[in-house]
A protein has these predicted regions:
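Conserved functional hotspot residues or short segments at active or partner-binding sites
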Residues: 353-354, 358-533
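Extended, small/polar residue-biased N-terminal targeting/export presequences
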Residues: 55-116, 162-195, 517-528, 533
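Cleft-lining beta-strand/loop regions that shape enzyme active-site pockets
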Residues: 25-40, 44, 48-56, 60-61, ...
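Polar, glycine-rich mid-to-C-terminal structural blocks
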Residues: 300, 312, 319, 323-391
């Protein structure tokens, strides 16, 4: 438990997904015609005017107004939120599933912008950029050695489609003058399906990281591809999926459920009940199905999980889901900002609400509830649903299993959190960015060896340098005052597996990472066992 407390801040910085605040988008944006408008000035407006005209120091009334809105929303539910105009573009990119840019992943370390990955057939790939390139300038702006931020670089590299940006760079192995490369920006996909591959001759695996406007199309393409390869059983991984566009999760549920089965319904004080039912023949209505969930599975992911559990269509494996059963509708405000207001609750086919309890007077307890599961040991030992459960319901299939509302979705089969990476030294590898820097450096230095592997499975089976890589990491980590020499044996093994997965990610991105790390994942192993029975 002591190790848990040390590791928790890092865990939640990585695990909890920004998609949770996106909520559900039931309709298109609705423009606000009267928000905070009245024939007579409101008290809030009067106070802002008085501060602006008479306050002793200079202040930003825009900032005060934003804070006033945030204060107002803090007395509602935990998921009603105000999104300033400056943050809307990034949020819309997540929902749309693409953005305009040059198609690279980069990381700043040693005060240098390093190209970590280049999107195949993307703008940078076509312009000749390579992994290992180091940017000196973007346009006329020097970006090396001046403490520039990731956000600043991202803003320089993104821009309207077909517009051009010139980068000046140094290339590994070249000792002449820096290169200048001009790149035409293009549409860069943000895939919501991380990976889809055949585990064996009959079992396919698909992982969805969020629900964007392109998710169902991505999912359908993945399913049809795997079916052509012989898929008869499926493992669907929704771990760490914080939700997104509700309609996309409904479409995927329709691929698993037959007839006109109810998938979910929503209702609120000012929102009449709306039922969402199956409308078409699904892509995978008959094959055996297992879902993987954890405490990061939330919102639209819980809609899908709840529907499949209620109809006994899938076996749920993993840990209790987050417990977000509130529907947000975005209202576009006149300045380009957006109010995401909770307008309804969603209910699974049995009628249960998955929303966990909250107090309108403050959200601290609500925000810390998942962390409390770690401190209480629930994620290690499972739970009986007794301390968080609401009303009991019976599933709608022949087994008539008992399920509960009011606190997320409890899996049918529990698999605890793997604590083998919770030692203090390993935690520091993540917090300090040491692990990412090492992986990049090692990969760039050994590129010819990695190019001999045909794919992730070949790499996992044929890579024999784990000990060599671990020893190199041990020496590298000492530069950041991290000592791995006394790490417990079990933690060392887990770290070696993670190193292999991260190296695979350098070559094949998320497809490589999950295809390798799944082979060492207890929850995945359990899912494969159950789906094969």
């Amino acid at each position: 438990m002591k190790k848990l407390k040390v590791w928790l801040p890092s865990l939640f910085a990585i695990v909890m997904i920004v998609g949770m605040i996106i909520g559900f988008r039931l309709r298109g944006n609705i423009r606000s015609n009267g928000f905070l408008k009245a024939r007579k000035s409101s008290t809030v407006e009067e106070v802002l005017d008085l501060v602006n005209n008479y306050y002793v120091d200079s202040v930003s009334t825009d900032t005060l107004g934003d804070n006033a809105i945030q204060g107002m929303l803090s007395h509602l539910d935990p998921h009603s939120s105000y999104i300033p105009a400056v943050d809307m573009a990034e949020m819309n990119e997540d929902l749309q599933g693409n953005f305009e840019g040059i198609g690279i992943e980069f990381q700043i370390f040693d005060d240098t912008v390093n190209v970590m990955n280049v999107l195949a057939d993307g703008p940078s790939d076509k312009a000749g950029l390579k992994v290992g390139d180091k940017f000196i300038k973007v346009g006329k702006s020097v970006v090396a050695g001046n403490g520039i931020s990731n956000d600043k670089i991202r803003g320089m590299l993104r821009g309207p489609g077909a517009s051009k940006v010139t980068v000046t760079l140094l290339r590994v192995g070249e000792h002449g003058e820096p290169r200048q490369v001009t790149i035409s920006r293009g549409t860069i996909p943000l895939p919501s399906v991380d990976v889809a591959y055949m585990v064996n001759k009959e079992t396919g695996y698909i992982r969805i990281n969020r629900f964007s406007e392109t998710t169902h199309a991505e999912f359908a393409q993945a399913v049809m591809k795997l079916q052509q390869e012989g898929m008869q059983r499926m493992i669907l991984d929704l771990r760490e999926n914080g939700g997104g566009v509700l309609q996309e999760s409904i479409e995927i549920a329709d691929d698993f459920l037959d007839d006109d089965k109810l998938i979910v319904y929503t209702v609120g004080v000012h929102s009449p009940r709306v039922d969402y039912r199956c409308k078409r023949d699904g892509l995978f209505e008959k094959g055996k199905l297992v879902l993987l969930t954890d405490e990061g599975t939330a919102s639209a992911s819980e809609v899908l999980t709840g529907a499949l559990q209620d109809w006994e269509r899938a076996t749920i494996i993993g840990r209790r889901t987050f417990g977000k059963g509130l529907v947000q509708q975005p209202f576009e405000l006149t300045d380009g900002s957006s109010l995401h207001l909770t307008i309804a609750r969603y209910y699974t086919p049995t009628g249960r609400s998955i929303q966990k309890p909250y107090d309108n007077s403050g959200h601290n307890d609500y925000n810390e509830e998942v962390m409390k599961r770690f401190h209480d040991g629930e994620v290690l030992h499972g739970d009986t649903s007794s301390h968080h459960a609401g009303l009991a319901y019976q599933t709608l299939g022949p087994e008539k299993r008992t399920v509960y509302g009011g606190g997320g979705i409890t899996p049918d089969i529990f698999v605890g959190f793997d604590t083998s990476t919770l030692s203090h030294s390993i935690t520091l590898l993540y917090i300090n960015g040491t692990l990412n820097r090492f992986i990049y450096t090692w990969y760039v230095q050994h590129l010819p060896a990695f190019r001999t592997f045909k794919g992730p499975a070949d790499f996992d089976a044929g890579f024999r340098d784990q000990d060599k890589v671990y020893d190199a990491l041990t020496r590298y980590a000492l530069k950041d005052s991290i000592d791995l020499r006394s790490v417990p044996a079990a933690d060392k093994i887990t770290l070696e597996h993670r190193l292999k997965g991260l190296l695979a990610r350098q070559i094949w991105r998320t497809e490589g990472f999950f295809e390798v790390t799944n082979n060492y994942d207890p929850a995945f192993a359990k899912a494969l066992e159950v789906v094969s029975q």
